Amino acid sequence: VLLRRKILALGLAAAALGQANEPAKPLVATTPRVPAVGIELPGDARAQLRERTDALGQAIDALARQHVDTPPLLHHLPDVQVYHKAVDWALKHRIFFKPSELKTAGELLVEGRERAAQLAKGKTPWTRATGLVVRGYVSRLDDSVQPYGLVIPPSVSTDPWRKRRLDIWLHGRDDKLSELKFIQQRHTSAGQFTPPDTIVLHPYGRFCNAFKFAGEMDVLEALAHAKTQYPVDGNRVSIRGFSMGGAGCWHLGTHFAGDWVAVAPGAGFAESLEYLGLTRKNAMPPAYEQTLWGLYDATKYAGNLFNTATVAYSGEIDKQRQAANIMERHLTAEGLALHHVIGPDTGHKYHPAAKAEIDDRVNAVAAKGRNPVPAEVRLVTQTLRYNRQGWVQVDGLETHWKPARVKARLTSEKRVEVATDNVSRLVLSMPSGLCPLRPNGNPTVVIDGDELTGARIRTDRSWEALFVNALGRWRAVGRFKFAGLAKRPGLQGPIDDAFINRFLMVRPTGPALSPMADKWTAAQLGQALSDWELQFRAKPLVKDDNDITDADIADCNLILWGDPQSNSTIARVIDQLPLGWSETTVQLGQAVAESATHAPMLIYPNPLNPKRYIVLNSGFTFSRFGHMSNATQTPKLPDWALVDMRRPYNAGDPTCIAAAGFFNERWQLPMPE
C-alpha cells in the first residue's frame, strides 16, 4: 500500500486527525477552463445562429420519429447530428475563437439541413461519396454523437466491394479544436498522407487528450464504425500521426501493436518522466502516480512492436525528437532496431524527402499486409487493460504494475512453446480458418518448461486453449474458475478505467453524513459533469440514486456520489466493500479519518454485478491538468484514496490526498508490510 501520511499513522485515533477549527473549503482547485472561452459574438449573429441551429435540431427530432421503425435509416442519423452538435456546442460553450468561424457555422448548418432533407426522403448519398466525407457515430461510453473524417479514394465508386487498406491519421495538439473547427478541417483538407486506393480515417479523439482515455476509445469506435460502412481490409490498417498525434501513435501503436500493419509516429512524446523533465525539475509526483505511468508510457510497451512494422520520423532539430530517441533505446533493449527517418535541418514538421521515404516504406509494408497468425508473438504489459497481442492473451497477472511478458512460438504443426513472466492466466486463441496447427490430435504446449496437452483444434480451423499458473506450475483448463473476486481484463482499475466503458453518474438525493460532505459532493459532482462535457465532449449519463434500474446495473459502471446516508445505492453495497464508513469515521485498511472531513474514492467490482465497476466520488482524475502538456494527462489516483474535503480538491495535489493505494489481485487491501 502506498500511503501519503498527511493525517495518520496506524493505530492513531481518528479524533486526532481532524482539526475542527480549520475553515471548511469544500472546493475544486481553480485551473484554466479547457477549452478556453472564445470571443464574444455579436448579439444579432448569435441569435440568428441559435435560431438556425434549433431549427436543425427540430428536423433531427422529426427524423428520429419518422424512422423509429426503420433502423437502417435511423443508424445514419448521427451523420446529421454531428453538424448540429458542432454549432450547438460552440454556442453553448462559447468556443468561437475567430470571426470567420461564424461563416463556418453557417456552412455546417447548411450541410446538416441538406443531409436531414435527404434522410427524410430515405436517401443517404454521403455514404457513397468519395473524397472528403464527414461521418458520425453514437459512442457506447455515454450515448454521445462523435464525428470523424474520411478520405475515400475515387476507386470506391467504381469498385465498391473490394477491401482496401485504411490508414488512421491522428491530429496534433490544438486546445481550440472544437467540433466546429474539426469538421471544417475535414471538409477542406485531406491531411498529410493520402496513399492511392487507401481510405484515410481522421478521428476527432474527443478533443485534446493525446488519444488516451475516452480519446483512445474514440479511435477504436470510429474505426469499428468505418468498418461497417466501407470495404476495409482488416489486415492492412495502419496508424500514423504527428506531434500530439505522434504521441497517440506511439501509445496506440505499442498497446495494440498486433492490430496494425504499420505504425508511423512523427514527433510527439512516448512517456512522461523524461519528456516533462520531472527529475531535473525536482517535481516528482507521488509514488502511486509514478506507478501509473505504466498504463500509457509507450516505452514500457516497446517490446510489443515486435508484432508490427514501425517507421518513426523526427525533424533533426525538433525538440520532440526525444520521443523517437527514447523509444529507440527501449527497442534496442528488446533486441529491435528502430527505423528512424530524420528530416535534415528540420524543426517541428515533415521534411519533403523524409516524408516521401516514410510513405514508400509504409506503402511497401501495407502492400504485403499483416499476418493475423504469425509464427511468433510477444506481449509486454503492466495491466490487464492491455492484455492481448495477436493470438496471445493474458487474463491474469501475478502482480499488476510490474512488467509481464509472454513469448509464444509455433515450433511445428503440433507444438507451441511459451515463456512467461508475471502471468497467472493465459489464453492462446486463433480465429476460424487461420490455425496452422495440425487439425487432428491435441497440440503439445510447453509453458515455462511445463509440457501440457492443449485443447484440440476445431473443425473450422479455430483454436482456443486456456492455462492457469498455480504455485509456479502450469496446467491446462477448460475454463477459468474464480473463487471470489479477482482482477481480470476490464476489471483491474485504476479509477480512470471506469470511464473507458459505459458509465452512469449516480446523484445522491438524501442528506449527507455532514454539512461539509453535502457541499463537497455537490461541488465535485458538478465539476466532474462539467469536466467530462468540456474535455471529453459529451454530456455524461446521469440519474438520481432512487432511479437506478436493473438494466443500469447490468450495463453500466456506476459512479456513485455521496455517502451511505445520502446515496441509497451506496447504502446497498457498502457492506460488501473493503471500506468502513460510519457517522464518525471512514476507514480503508490502515487509513482512518473523520467522515465529517474526509471522503473515500475508490474503484471496485460492483457487488450488484461483479462484471461492472462501481466508483465512489470521482470523475476522471487528470481534469485539473487539461490545460497543460498532454504528457501530464495520466491517471492521478490509483484504486482508492481518502481525500481531505477541507482543501480545494485536485487529484494531482498530494496535499489533499490523505492516503491512497492499490488493491491486490484479489481486490483486497494488501497486508501491512
Task: Give names to the regions the model predicted.
Residues E22-V80:
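Amphipathic, heptad-repeat alpha-helical segments
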Residues I239-G241, A264-G266, Y313:
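Short beta-strand immediately N-terminal to the catalytic nucleophile in serine-hydrolase-like folds
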Residues Y313, I317-V423:
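C-terminal catalytic histidine-bearing segment of alpha/beta-hydrolase fold enzymes
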